[in-house]
Amino acid sequence: MHIAEGFLPPAHAIAWGVASAPFVVHGVRSLTREVREHPESTLLLGASGAFTFVLSALKLPSVTGSCSHPTGTGLGAILFRPPIMAVLGTITLLFQALLLAHGGLTTLGANVFSMAIVGPWAGYGVYRLLRRWDVPLMVTVFFGAFVADLSTYCVTSVQLALAFPDPSSGFLGALGKFGSIFAVTQIPLAVSEGLLTVIVMRLLVQSSKGELTRLGVLLTRTGERKQEAVAR
């Protein structure tokens, strides 16, 4: 999903950076407030960031100028909400661009928009919707992570199609081509990420029940927080 350094036209790179900036600024405020009011959450924040960094560094070759990999953003979005995940995702993408040559600085805005903004919001939206319908927690976690991953690649396909429309069929033709190529690797990766996120969440339920209760992850059917609901 990481679009390579220098691959996007300058105007596109700037536009995606401008579009991403307000979300990241808002996320910094949310993260600062979270750490100030709940300093005990720093360990879980670090774990969420590390989960994203490790998973998104496992890249497979895909469309020219990009690659396929898990994103790892669904977990952090479920735990701390999408604004904070925008910051954790941006830090992840920046370090990967500088240390791993994965992505790039000129394409940072585009990569942030797809992986650190749209992915977490889409995944969190599905997670919250399923929770409202009283779907078991681990099922909602799976679909939240699955959608966060898959929606990231949908946005990347849009970004590439906007930058490089097909000479004959234009934007829609390019979108279909980019999306279909990504789908070959990304759908299995999204399923795998969903299952892995469920495993991690089960471990967190066993080790950090109090923190998950405070964050609102452990809820009863009536909306009250409770720990035993996760056993389903």
UniProtKB/Swiss-Prot annotation:
The organism's place on the tree of life at top rank: Bacteria
Transmembrane segments: 6-26, 43-63, 84-104, 107-127, 135-155, 181-201
Gene3D superfamilies in the cross-refs: 1.10.1760.20
Chief location of this protein within or outside the cell: membrane
Membrane topology classification: Multi-pass membrane protein
Keyword Transcription: no
Subunit structure: Forms an energy-coupling factor (ECF) transporter complex composed of an ATP-binding protein (A component, CbiO), a transmembrane protein (T component, CbiQ) and 2 possible substrate-capture proteins (S components, CbiM and CbiN) of unknown stoichimetry.
Family: Belongs to the CbiM family.
Protein name per UniProt: Cobalt transport protein CbiM
Organism field: Streptomyces coelicolor (strain ATCC BAA-471 / A3(2) / M145)
Gene behind the chain: cbiM
